[in-house]
A protein has these predicted regions:
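Sec-dependent N-terminal signal peptides
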Residues: 6-14
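Lipid interaction determinants
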Residues: 5-7, 19-145
Length: 145
């Protein structure tokens, strides 16, 4: 009985060892969708969060292909389509509140989202660039639960 168990034990050990050797990705590429992306840089300049205003951010909701967020003063919303490396925001709209500060940055941010963008995530950063590869926005992630 012991001799018959030895091959089974060796086979089990071998299979467990091989399974442990399979490569696992060290860090998966962060998903564009279903994450809170805080705008931290716009056209090479850091983006400040104004006191008593919402930080500029985007959330791309995968289930309905809707985008929501803030330009810093106004809420923004619309739809989008995305693939492995491009995203296009569509039918973008915003509330129309006036704020004492940050309106220029908000308008630049909203205009920058027009057209097709190239996107890439590295570590906890989302980078958007135009068709020529010029980076215009960087975001940091805050994971949604």
């Amino acid at each position: 009985m012991r001799i018959a168990s030895l091959p089974l034990l060796l086979l089990t050990t071998l299979l467990v060892g091989v399974a442990g050797c399979q490569s696992q990705p060290a860090h998966d590429k962060l998903a564009l969708e279903n994450n809170y992306w805080k705008l931290v840089e716009l056209h090479g300049k850091p983006v400040a969060v104004i006191d008593n205003q919402t930080e500029p951010h985007l959330i791309l909701h995968a289930d309905k292909k809707r985008v929501a967020g803030s330009g810093g003063c106004n809420r923004i919303m619309g739809s989008y389509s995305a693939n492995a490396d491009t995203v296009q925001f569509k039918q973008m709209a915003s509330t129309m509140m006036a704020c004492a500060q940050g309106m220029d940055t908000e308008q630049i941010f909203l205009r920058s989202l027009e057209g097709e963008q190239h996107w890439v995530t590295t570590h906890d950063t989302l980078t958007l660039s135009d068709k020529q590869g010029k980076v215009f926005a960087r975001f940091s992630v805050a994971y949604l639960r």
